Each structure stands twice: as structure tokens, then as C-alpha cells.
Amino acid sequence: MGMTSDTIADLLTRIRNALKAEHLYVDLEHSKMRESIVKILKHHGFLARYLVKEENRKRTMRIFLQYSDDRRPVIRQLKRVSKPSRRVYVPAAKIPYVFGNMGISVLSTSQGVLDGSTARAKNIGGELLCLVW
């Protein structure tokens, strides 16, 4: 499994594809950044749960996807904003409200990876990683 240069875009694509295929979970290589993002998505109810496994000194993550009672994916859209080729930084005042506030933004800040409402409350901006709704 080759790591792409943009592991966040890869994470979002893998979740998107797994949801389309109605899979229960998706396995991928672990990174601290990926786990931070997944933790936020789980906290907001977009993912069911996740596990981190270690085999032969290689860490992988298993992300369990979340579906509604009628088996529709809870996540409608995952959008990568900042990219390695074009970084996007926003001050606290410019953190977007996503999908009538039903979605979330995820930022990398000086205080770690935060969702938009937390960053806004702390009055800190950062790199706008992705939007989820």
C-alpha cells in the first residue's frame, strides 16, 4: 500500500469509496494526523468508531462507517480544502460554517487538530484541512 503524498486526501477518498460500496469499515495506514481527523469525525457522529492496530511494528487503522437507520451514509460529502500544492489558512473569524451548521470544518492549529467551532471558540485560526457534512 503506497502512501500518497497527501495522506489526508487519501483518507477522505478511502472513506468516500467505502461508503459508496456500503462497506462496514475501511482499513488504512495509521498516522497521528489521520487519527486526529477521524477522532473529530467520530465525536460529531460522522463515523461509528475506529481501532488502531499494530502488527510487525506497522500501525493501521480500522474505521467503522456510520449509516442511518435506512442504511444511508451519515456523511454526505467530504471535501479536502487545503492541499500540499495550495495551502489554505483561515483566521478564526473566517472559519466557515458548514452546511447550515450541520457539517463541520477541521483545522490544523497551533493547539492541534480541532473542529471549526472549537477553534472559533478559542479564537484561533489555522490550516483548513477539510469540510464534512
From Swiss-Prot:
Coiled coil: none
GO BP, sorted A to Z: translation
Pfam families tied to this protein: Ribosomal_S8 (PF00410)
Keyword Ribosomal protein belongs to the record: yes
HAMAP family cross-referenced by the UniProt entry: Ribosomal_uS8_B
Task performed by this protein: One of the primary rRNA binding proteins, it binds directly to 16S rRNA central domain where it helps coordinate assembly of the platform of the 30S subunit.
This protein's name: Small ribosomal subunit protein uS8
Organism listed in the record: Chlamydia felis (strain Fe/C-56) (Chlamydophila felis)
Designated gene of the protein: rpsH
